[in-house]
Design a protein with these regions (language model features):
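Short hydrophobic alpha-helical runs that function as membrane-insertion/retention elements
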Residues: 138, 163-167, 191, 213-217, ...
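N-terminal accessory targeting/assembly segments
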Residues: 1-95
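Conserved nucleotide-binding/hydrolysis micro-motifs of P-loop NTPases
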Residues: 46, 95-98, 104-106, 120, ...
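P-loop NTPase nucleotide-binding module
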Residues: 116, 127-172
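P-loop NTP-binding catalytic core
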Residues: 65, 77-137, 177
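Conserved P-loop NTPase nucleotide-binding/switch module
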Residues: 210-211, 215-271
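P-loop NTPase switch/communication element
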Residues: 158-205, 251-261
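Conserved P-loop NTPase
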Residues: 265-340
């Protein structure tokens, strides 16, 4: 299995155009645009740029100028991006960039995080067999590791042959504005007026638009986990992300553990406890998992795959090591799979 060379679209000039000139000039002087993750501007502090610097962590954050960020600097950016949503996020029309605001208690913007959004074509080559399988897939990983990028590419690829609907709560998958970014291909996109309504839009997507696949970013609330289960029970393939980095994280999260079947305490009979060699009170999986497959993104092009969430959860609860696959792209661009 080979991983084709990735084509990247970042619309970076659109982001640079909303930044103060001195910051834009500093960024151009540094270069390293392929590694740029975000620009941070906090009132009274020097502006910084952050990079995905894997080889040298000391180069992951750079000060862009000695002059501290002023209210005029912040106003310059805010004036070019428009109003923030209720989650203090804004975007740039027809791009994947995200600008998040920090406000004081009076509602004035005192800080900005300008996140670079990229469409990276070819990122799902490493898991294309699972994506095409029709199984529901949950992606986990730390912020900035590439979950949303992979989600976006999955939507684009699947939309070539299936009815795909994206529930885009923060417009991070399909970009800002009413016309979705070309990176999602033929997938349809439903926007969400405020984050607390995400679960309702998930159900609306199923009831009104007859999708075969629903793509959802950042499942983080109990109502969203419940909506995901309802969708899966209707036979719709789900591809989503959730807060957490590993399967064990999710199992210990009372809000989201329902995604992997839920965990409950049960009392065994004396005979069953002897047969298992355990105490009478044990933890067990409560129900079938909402997601069939769970993928932990540990680094770009390096993943841990749990091919069967049900089997993995049961194994962990009984003190066994679950069956997993380590997948990575080697120096020659080939996808390697190591089963444990």
């Amino acid at each position: 299995m080979t991983n084709p060379a990735n084509k990247i679209t970042d619309d970076l000039d659109d982001l640079l155009n909303v930044l103060p000139g001195s910051i834009t000039s500093a960024l151009r002087g540094v270069g390293r645009f392929d590694e740029l993750i975000e620009i941070v501007m906090d009132l009274g502090r020097t502006p910084e740029s952050r990079y995905a610097s894997f080889a040298d962590p000391s180069q992951a954050e750079l000060i862009l100028r000695r002059e501290e960020v002023s209210l005029d600097d912040l106003a310059f950016v805010v004036g070019r991006i428009g109003d923030f949503d209720t989650d203090n996020r804004a975007g740039i029309t027809r791009t994947l960039h995200r600008i998040s605001g920090i406000k004081n208690r009076r509602g004035a913007v005192v800080g900005l995080t300008c996140r670079v959004g990229r469409a990276v074509y070819g990122t799902i080559g490493i898991i294309e067999d699972f994506i095409a399988s029709g199984k529901s897939i949950l992606l986990l990983g730390r912020p900035g590791i590439g979950k949303t990028t992979m989600l976006r590419e999955a939507a684009r690829v699947l939309a070539d042959g299936k009815r795909v609907v994206i529930v885009d709560t923060s417009n991070e998958i399909g970009g800002d504005g009413d016309i979705p970014h070309p990176a999602v291909g033929r997938a349809r996109r439903m926007q969400v007026s405020k984050p607390s309504m995400q679960h309702e839009v998930m159900i609306e997507a199923v009831e009104n638009h007859n999708p075969q696949v629903i793509v959802i970013d950042e499942i983080g609330r109990a109502l969203e986990a419940e909506a995901a289960r309802t969708i899966a029970e209707r036979g719709v393939q789900l591809i989503g992300t959730a807060h957490g980095q590993t399967l064990e994280n999710l199992m210990s999260n009372p809000t989201l553990s329902d995604l992997i079947g839920g965990i409950e305490s049960v009392t065994l009979s004396d005979e069953e406890a002897r047969r298992r060699g355990t105490q009478k009170t044990v933890l067990e999986r409560r129900a079938p998992p909402t997601f069939d497959v769970l993928i932990e993104i540990h680094a770009r092009n390096r993943l841990i795959v749990h091919p069967s969430v049900a089997d993995a959860v049961d194994a962990i609860l009984r003190g066994r090591v679950p069956v997993t696959e380590l997948r990575y792209v080697d120096a020659a661009g080939a996808v390697q799979v190591e089963r444990t």
